[in-house]
């Protein structure tokens, strides 16, 4: 069968990517929700409980979309590649016929039980409800680990020296196939990615509800909801570069040809685009922090040790020097970098010289822009190719900026600036007073931008991981002999990734409005002046 307009491979790509996005949300949102519910119980703050319940309502609606797109994915895959699909399902029959359906049914039961016992198990029974949420998350994690087995198998099927791949797979157990080289790092990367993804989507929902709120009370709540969601998302985002590097390291260790194919050959411009998007993501996070600080009364009185801006300025060049001399996993790199990064927090109290919080944030922004520039610096000025003419390469002395030590240094600096801003923001809200509901209106567009960007990055890097198989369905085992067995251009891929992202965001937006609109006050209440609320 040949799908019109898109072709078979792109048709499979569209439904698979949509399914993965919905699945990522319903697997990541429960982690986000239980953390929020636990914080509400611990702090006795009903806002956290309301946040958790509202996101659960949206998750339940999107649960059906996950099932629909999953079923559609199987049908399209069978129609487009019947022989491969049948053979692949037989390889993982126990997963697809027993484990995955059983876990999915268990997740469905627990999801609905979690929602409909919310108002029943409260007060003294709240701990019971949180325990149910933890159980739901355990099942979600099991689903993630189970389904990542076949997914990672397609990139890194197990192998052994002296044995042909076909003979080894024929004798391999189900566990051998699941526990392949990229299975665990892929699972780790998806766990923290799903937590961040759930937080960004929750922030987008908060932005919609803030913009549609009719009363100051509702605006104050959804302002707070966006604030809480984005910082939970940041927690997941800070881990993603490192789990992503671990995944790339394991895949390159499995077959070194993956590395140049990603970084210097057919997919090099995909990685350039990834650098741009992740740089924009971190800039957006820190811009939201800046807008949040501006609405805190007393923020101008918050000071930070002079060591903070000094370390921000010297960290990038210092890290590049250390990484060049002591590359991973040499522990000497930590011996140099940890004292430097911790010095503002450990030694700052002994140094009387301080600077304002806003000065630190501004310097951090400049350092982030420089780090982004280093991250994006290519080895040369052509899209692909490892053997470029000298006039197309970076000038001698500047070529270091395209090396992996420089790239890792830029990532580390981006994460460090975000951590410093987070610490500074927490210090500000403890010493000042937040006027909830009075944040700059532009912050709502930042939240929507962050959700869109994180979704787009997921689509891009999913495409990269899949395209690493080159002209195989299962790398080195099952060849793809179809006419579509080629690496698409970045423009073609980006077009479909954007279309998929827009479709996903639109469906989530409708689900959020359907689930949460009744909770907004129907009658317009008279607005008074905003009441300052001390941050907790």
Enumerate the predicted regions with their spans:
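N-terminal signal-anchor module of multipass membrane proteins
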Residues: 1-54, 58-67
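Membrane-interfacial loop-to-helix junctions in multi-pass inner-membrane proteins
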Residues: 44-61, 87-94, 98, 118-138, ...
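Hydrophobic alpha-helical membrane-insertion segments
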Residues: 59-70, 134-155, 231-244, 309-320, ...
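Hard-cation-handling environments
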Residues: 271-374
């Amino acid at each position: 069968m040949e799908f019109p307009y898109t072709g078979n491979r792109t048709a499979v790509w569209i439904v698979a990517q949509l399914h993965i996005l919905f699945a990522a949300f319903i697997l990541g949102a429960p982690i986000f929700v239980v953390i929020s519910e636990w914080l509400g119980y611990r702090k006795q703050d009903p806002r956290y409980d309301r946040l958790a319940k509202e996101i659960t309502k949206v998750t339940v609606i999107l649960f059906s979309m996950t099932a629909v797109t999953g079923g559609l994915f199987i049908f399209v895959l069978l129609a487009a590649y019947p022989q491969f699909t049948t053979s692949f399902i037989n390889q993982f029959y126990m997963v697809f016929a027993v484990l995955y359906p059983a876990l999915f049914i268990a997740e469905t039961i627990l999801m609905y039980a979690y929602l409909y016992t919310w108002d029943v198990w409260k007060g003294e029974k709240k701990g019971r409800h949180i325990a149910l949420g933890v159980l739901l998350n355990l099942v979600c994690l099991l689903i993630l680990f189970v389904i990542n087995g076949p997914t990672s198998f397609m990139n890194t099927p197990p192998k052994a020296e002296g044995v042909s791949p076909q003979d080894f797979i024929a004798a391999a157990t189900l566990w051998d196939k699941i526990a392949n080289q990229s299975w665990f790092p892929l699972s780790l990367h998806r766990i923290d990615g799903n937590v961040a993804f759930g937080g960004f989507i929750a922030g987008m929902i908060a932005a919609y509800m803030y913009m549609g709120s009719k009363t100051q009370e509702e605006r104050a709540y959804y302002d707070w909801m966006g604030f809480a969601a984005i910082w939970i998302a940041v927690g997941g985002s800070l881990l993603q570069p490192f789990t992503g590097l671990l995944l790339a390291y394991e895949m390159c260790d499995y077959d070194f040809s993956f590395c140049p194919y990603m970084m210097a050959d057919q997919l090099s411009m995909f990685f350039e685009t990834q650098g741009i998007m992740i740089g924009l993501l971190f800039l957006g996070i820190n811009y939201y922090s800046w807008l949040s600080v501006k609405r805190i009364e007393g923020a101008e009185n918050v000071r930070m040790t002079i060591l903070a801006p000094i370390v921000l300025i010297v960290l990038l060049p210092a890290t590049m020097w250390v990484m060049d001399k002591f590359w991973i996993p040499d522990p000497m790199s930590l011996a140099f970098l940890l004292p430097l990064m911790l010095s503002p927090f450990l030694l700052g109290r002994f140094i009387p010289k301080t600077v304002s919080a806003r000065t630190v944030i501004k310097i951090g922004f400049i350092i982030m822009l420089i780090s982004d520039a280093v991250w994006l610096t290519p080895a040369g000025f052509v899209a692909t190719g490892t053997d470029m003419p000298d006039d197309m390469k970076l000038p001698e002395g500047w070529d270091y900026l395209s090396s992996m030590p420089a790239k890792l240094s830029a990532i580390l600096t981006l994460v460090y600036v975000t951590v410093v801003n987070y610490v500074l923001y927490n210090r500000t809200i403890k010493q000042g007073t937040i006027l909830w509901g009075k944040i700059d209106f532009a912050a709502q567009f930042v939240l929507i931008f962050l959700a869109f960007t994180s979704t787009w990055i997921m689509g891009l890097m999913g495409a990269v991981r899949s395209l690493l198989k080159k002209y195989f369905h299962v790398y080195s085992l099952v060849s793809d002999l179809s006419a579509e067995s080629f690496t698409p251009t970045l423009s073609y891929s980006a077009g479909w990734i954007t279309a998929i992202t827009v479709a996903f965001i639109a469906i989530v937006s409708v689900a959020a409005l359907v689930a949460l609109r009744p909770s907004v006050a129907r009658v317009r209440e008279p607005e008074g002046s905003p009441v300052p609320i001390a941050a907790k």
